[in-house]
């Protein structure tokens, strides 16, 4: 891979390197904690921004996510989920706590860009063809769970098994939510309300 300075840290880091960083962080290595923060910050912030709908809350929840990571990293175990799925699970839990305490969603009129934007994604092409505001309106018709699944799958490129762990659901439930969400979006695009 290139060492281009504009390349995102998460794209440069291998699973083996992240594993080494986690092991070092578990032994109290501050530099390893800082590097884990830098590698994952953009993706965690982007996920929370898309989840809670505004920058201020996303910033607060991102800070809380990394504080929880700092408090809990000693208990992290490499079982069936990668470190990033564990970290996203912390972010997801905090966002659910946020929704329970605020009981409302306050979206901004912007959609964050996908993170692997070397090639236009299906999401980007759809946004260009129907417009950002129209896409927001379409996505807003989906259930919160469907929105979460699509975000984790198509914006953050998690596998179904990892999405299931993050959202604490079965892999079958994730596939079903994804299928229903995509079918709903397809129906809405093909048959817009008159």
Task: Label each region the model flagged.
Residues 1-12, 24, 128-129, 134-137, ...:
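C-terminal edge and immediately downstream basic/flexible tail or linker adjoining helix-turn-helix-like DNA-binding
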Residues 1-43, 50, 132, 140:
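N-terminal module of bacterial RNA polymerase sigma factors
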Residues 3, 24-35, 45-64, 171, ...:
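Short, charged helix-capping/linker segments at alpha-helix termini
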Residues 4-5, 14-18, 97, 105-132:
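Internal acidic/polar
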Residues 26-27, 53, 64-81, 101-103:
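Sigma70-family region 2
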Residues 60-67, 81-93:
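Structural recognition of an alpha-helix C-terminal capping motif at a helix-to-coil junction
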Residues 71-78, 89-109, 128:
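Arg/Lys-rich amphipathic alpha helix in sigma70-family domain 2
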Residues 96, 146, 155, 161, ...:
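DNA-recognition helix of helix-turn-helix
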């Amino acid at each position: 891979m290139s060492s281009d300075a504009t390349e995102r840290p998460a794209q440069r880091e291998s699973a083996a390197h992240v594993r080494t960083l986690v092991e070092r962080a578990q032994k109290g290595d501050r530099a390893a904690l800082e590097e884990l923060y830098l590698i994952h910050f953009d993706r965690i912030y982007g996920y929370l921004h898309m989840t809670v709908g505004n920058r201020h809350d996303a910033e607060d929840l991102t800070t809380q996510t990394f504080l929880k990571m700092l408090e809990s990293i000693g208990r992290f175990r490499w079982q069936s989920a990668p470190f990033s799925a564990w970290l996203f699970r912390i972010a997801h839990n905090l966002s659910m706590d946020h929704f329970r305490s605020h009981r409302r969603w306050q979206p901004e009129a912007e959609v964050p860009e996908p993170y692997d934007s070397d090639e236009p994604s299906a999401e980007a092409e759809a946004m260009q063809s129907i417009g950002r505001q129209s896409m927001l309106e379409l996505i807003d018709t989906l259930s919160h769970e469907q929105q979460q699944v699509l975000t984790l799958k198509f914006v953050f490129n998690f596998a179904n098994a990892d999405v299931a762990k993050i959202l604490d659901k079965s892999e079958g439930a994730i596939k079903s939510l994804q299928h229903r969400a995509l079918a709903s979006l397809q129906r809405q695009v093909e048959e817009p309300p008159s």
